[in-house]
Amino acid sequence: MTFEQAKKRSLVLKEQLEKWNYEYYVNDNPSVSDQEYDRALQELIAIEQQYSELITIDSPTQRVSGQISEKFNKYVHTSPMLSLGNAFNYDDLIHFDEQIKEFTALPEIEYTCELKIDGLSISLVYDNHVLVMGATRGDGLTGEDVTINIKQIKSIPLRIDQPTLIVRGEVYLSVEEFNKINEERVKNGEFKFANPRNAAAGTLRQLDSTIVAKRKLNAFLYYYVNALQDGIQSQYEALQRLEQLKFKINPEYRYCSNIAAVWAYIQEYEPKRNQLGYEIDGIVIKVNNLNLYNRIGYTAKNPKWAIAYKFPAEVVVTKLLNIFPSVGRTGRITYNAVLEPIRIVGTIVRAATLHNADFITERDIRIGDNVQVKKAGDIIPEVINYVAARRQKNAQKWQEATHCPECNSLLERVEGEVDQYCINSVCPKKITRGLEHYCSRNAMNIEGISEKIIERLFKLEYLKSFSDLYQLEQYRAEIIELENFGEKSFENMITSINNSKNNSLERLLFALGIRHVGQKTAKLLARQFKTIDNLAAMNIEQLSIINDIGPIVAASVVDYFAIPANQQELALLRQNGVKMEYFATNQHLAQKFENYRFVITGVLSKSREYFKELIESYGGQVSESVSAKTTYLLAGTDAGNKLVKAQKLNVKIINEEEFQQLLSKED
C-alpha cells in the first residue's frame, strides 16, 4: 500500500471506528459485531505502524495505551469547579426557589433537572477540534492531568465538530461493571472496592493506563463552560448542543417550568434510583436561563443558581450476626456490626458501624437482633437501632470491650468523651493506621505505598515509624522480591518518599496525627509559627489566644511535643532530611497579609474560593462573618447584610479593584 493509499484508508477507518464507538458506547445500539470492530482497529494499527506520520492524537488507536505514568501533573482549571449546596426536603427546595425569585425579581423560575451521578467530576478541554486535556476536579481550583486515562473511556470523543470547548461531567462505573471488577479482585486476593464511585475514582487515577482500559469506565457530560459566549441561552439548550457534538448525556434530564414541576420530577425518580444500572445520589436542579447566573451569583463554594437535592438515606432491615471492635490511628475504638448481607443503594452491605460503646448500650442492641441499617450520605453504612417487635428471646446481651482487640492493652476513656481509647504507644494497629495517615494524599502525599504494603513491611519489621520510611532503601533487595512488587514499584515508592521531605510544615503537622489538628488547623499553625521548633516552644496560654485555636487544641499540641517518644521521632525525621518549616512559593508574598482578616461577599469576577486561596497564599485569613476583628470586607455586587454590618462596625470596605491595588502595593 502506497503512502497516499494508506492516508485515504486511515481516514476512512478513523471515521468508521469513531462512528461505531458512538453507536456502542453512547447510543448503546451497535451496528457491527465486536469482531468487525476489532478487525478495523487492527487494520488501522497496522497502517499507522507502517506509516507513523499518519498517527494523530484523535486516532482511535490512541485510546489503546500501555503507558505507565510516573505521576500526574497538576492542572489549573480556567474557571473553578465548584461544589453544589444541598437540599434535603421540599421546604429546602421552596426556600431555594424563593431566593432565586428574590435575586432575579421574577415571578416564576424555570429549571432544568438532571440525575446526580455518583462518580468522579472531570473537565475536558478541546482545542482545534481535538481533546487536549482531561483533568480531575481536585480541590476545585487545581486538578490532575489524567488525559491518558480519559482517552480510555470510549464514550468520550477524541474529536468534535467544534473548534474549542470546555465541558465538564462525571466519570462513573455501571453497577454491572463494578460487580465484575470486584469479582476479579477477590479472585486475585485483592480488597474489594467499597462502591462504584470509589472504583471509578481509583481507576481514573491509575498510573498504568492498561488497567484503565480494561475497566469499562463511562462518562456523562453536563456542563458547557462559556455556553453564553457561544450563543447558548439555557442549560436545556446546552445539553442538546452537547448531544449534537456526540457527547454522552444522561437521557433523563428534563425542563421544568417551575419548582412544582421540579418536585414532581424528584418524586418520579426517587423510587427508580436502584433501577438505572448506575448509581445516583440525588437530583441536580439548575436555573435554566443562563443569562441569570451572574445576577444570582455565587457563594465561596457553590453557585447560587443550582442546588443538589439529596435523597433520604435508604433504610433496610437485616440480622445482626456479631459485633467487634477495631482501633484507629489515635487509638479510638470503633464498634462494627457483622450483618446478614443486604442490598442498600445498589451495593451489597455485610458490615456497618455501630460508632461507640455508649451508642450500643443506650439502645440495648443485641447480637441476633434485626437491625435498621442506612448508608450515611449514601457512603458509610451505619446501624440506627434494633426492631423491637422482631427481637428473639435468645438475642445475646452485648458486653463492651475492656481490652484493645489488637494489643490487648486495657482500654481507657478520656474525660468528657464517649469514646474508649487504646493508649499503648506500640499497638501494632495504631502504628500501621498512623503510617497510612502519614502517607495519605492530604498529608505527606507518598504514592505507591498502600495499606496492604504498609502492613507487610510492618510485619517484616522494616517499617515501624514515620522515620523508617526514609530508611527503606536499605531493604531494596528484600522488598523487590515481595509478591506483586518489583524494581519499578520500589523506585516509584522511594522517589515519592524522597519528594515528601520537601513538603511545607502544614503537611507534616497534619501527617503527624496530633489529636484535634486537622488540615485547616495545621495550615493555621504553620503560617503562624513558621517552624516546628517555634510551635513546640509554645505553652497552652500562648496557643489559646490565636484566632480559631481554642484550649482543647492548644492542650493537645502542647501534650504532643512534651512526649519524649515524639521528640525522638521528630529528631529522626530531621536527621533524614524532612523539612520542618513553612514555606510558600514566595516567602515575602506569604507574609504580605499576615495578621489580616478578610471577609468576602457579593458577586465578584471569580469565585470566592479563588479569592480565599489567594488571600491565604499571601498569609491572610478568611472568615465567614464580619466582626470587629475584620481587617477588610472584599465586596462585590449584591453584597447584602455583611456590607451593612461592616459599615456599622467601621470595617474597611474594598472592591475588587482596590483589592488588586493591595496585592500590587509595595511593602
From Swiss-Prot:
SMART domains xrefs: BRCT (SM00292), HhH1 (SM00278), LIGANc (SM00532)
Give binding positions for Zn(2+).
Answer: C404, C407, C422, C427
Does Cell inner membrane show up as a keyword for this record?
Answer: no
Q: Name one GO molecular function term.
A: DNA binding
Q: Which residues form the BRCT domain?
A: 588-667
**Catalysis performed (reactions):** NAD(+) + (deoxyribonucleotide)n-3'-hydroxyl + 5'-phospho-(deoxyribonucleotide)m = (deoxyribonucleotide)n+m + AMP + beta-nicotinamide D-nucleotide
Enzyme Commission number(s) from the entry = 6.5.1.2
Does Translocase show up as a keyword for this record?
Answer: no
The family database entries (InterPro entries) matched by this protein are listed as:
BRCT_dom (IPR001357), BRCT_dom_sf (IPR036420), DisA/LigA_HHH (IPR041663), DNA_ligase (IPR001679), DNAligase_adenylation (IPR013839), DNAligase_N (IPR013840), Hlx-hairpin-Hlx_DNA-bd_motif (IPR003583), NA-bd_OB-fold (IPR012340)
Q: What protein family does this chain belong to?
A: Belongs to the NAD-dependent DNA ligase family. LigA subfamily.
Q: Which PANTHER family match?
A: CHROMOSOME TRANSMISSION FIDELITY FACTOR 18 (PTHR23389), DNA LIGASE (PTHR23389:SF9)
- The protein's name in its UniProt record: DNA ligase
Gene name per UniProt: ligA
